[in-house]
Structures are given as structure tokens and as C-alpha cells.
């Protein structure tokens, strides 16, 4: 690993620890003695989302966050709940073993998570995601929720 101070290629690891999504390594340059930190992460496949019009765009977790924040407005859903939900959805997507996923699949994963979190947030999200044509479709969703 190149030293950021003297650019020497000779350094040794003096400490390794697991960080959130990486391994944190403390290093010391063998030439100048400078100590520095590096992080080692797994390089994940870039995810592409296949939209309804068959266009592809990079996966953007912030879009899910924004949708959840809107759906959870004035509901007892914390930002931590939203972050956990998004992390669970992203984990499910990455477990699909493909670097392309249809937007419908993402929406269904979000719905599964919201069904466990908060009914009103679930209904709000579903009303936008499923684009209900009339009240009967919403009534059907409400019947399914009340059966829980």
C-alpha cells in the first residue's frame, strides 16, 4: 500500500478490525514511519433497474428512501426504520444473483417490508406503487390487511 506521505510502497499492517461494511486496517510506512488507515471493501456488482418502459438505470437506494419518507409522513416510523427497510430491500435484491432487476420486483420487496412495519405507510406506498384505478382495488388491499 502506498504511503500517503512519502509514496513508498512498503508498509505493514499493525491492526485490522471489522468496520460496518469493510475491514479497517491501520498501517505504518516502513520508510518514514507515518501511520495511516485503509479500508477494504467488497466490490459489489453495479445494479441496474429495468423500468416499465424497458429502459435501464442504475439502482438508487435514495429513491426508495424518498418514497418511504413520503409514505411514512406523520406516522410512527423512525428514520432508523426506514434505513433498515431500505437495507433489507437492497439485501434481497443483491441475493437475486443478477445485476439487473425489474422495478416491479423492487416495489414488491418494499411492500413486503412495509407490511410488517406500519399498515398506513403500507397503504400509502401501495396506492402510488400499484396505481389503483378505482376504489375497489384499494378496498381489496384493505381487506388483505385486516385479515392479518
Curated annotation (Swiss-Prot):
It comes from the Bacteria. Its cofactor is Zn(2+). Belongs to the NrdR family. Pfam families: ATP-cone (PF03477), Zn_ribbon_NrdR (PF22811). Keywords: ATP-binding, DNA-binding, Metal-binding, Nucleotide-binding, Repressor, Transcription, Transcription regulation, Zinc, Zinc-finger. InterPro entries: ATP-cone_dom, NrdR-like_N, RNR_NrdR-like. This is Transcriptional repressor NrdR. GO terms for molecular function: ATP binding; DNA binding; zinc ion binding. Negatively regulates transcription of bacterial ribonucleotide reductase nrd genes and operons by binding to NrdR-boxes. One of its GO terms (biological process) is negative regulation of DNA-templated transcription. A zinc finger (unnamed) spans 3-32. Residues 47-137 form the ATP-cone domain. Binds 1 zinc ion. Transmembrane segments: none annotated.
Amino acid at each position: 500500500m502506498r504511503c500517503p506521505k512519502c509514496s513508498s510502497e512498503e508498509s505493514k499492517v499493525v491492526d485490522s478490525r471489522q468496520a460496518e461494511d469493510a475491514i479497517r486496517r491501520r498501517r505504518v510506512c516502513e520508510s518514514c514511519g507515518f501511520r495511516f488507515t485503509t479500508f477494504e471493501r467488497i466490490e459489489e456488482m453495479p445494479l441496474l433497474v429495468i423500468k416499465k418502459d424497458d429502459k435501464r438505470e442504475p439502482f438508487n437506494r435514495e429513491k426508495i428512501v424518498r418514497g418511504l419518507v413520503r409514505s411514512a409522513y406523520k406516522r410512527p416510523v423512525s428514520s432508523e426504520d426506514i434505513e433498515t427497510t431500505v437495507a433489507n430491500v437492497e439485501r434481497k435484491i443483491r441475493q437475486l444473483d443478477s445485476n439487473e432487476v425489474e422495478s416491479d420486483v423492487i416495489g414488491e420487496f418494499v411492500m413486503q417490508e412495509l407490511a410488517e412495519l406500519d399498515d398506513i405507510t403500507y397503504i400509502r406506498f401501495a396506492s402510488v406503487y400499484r396505481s389503483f384505478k378505482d376504489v375497489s382495488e384499494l378496498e381489496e388491499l384493505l381487506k388483505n390487511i385486516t385479515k392479518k
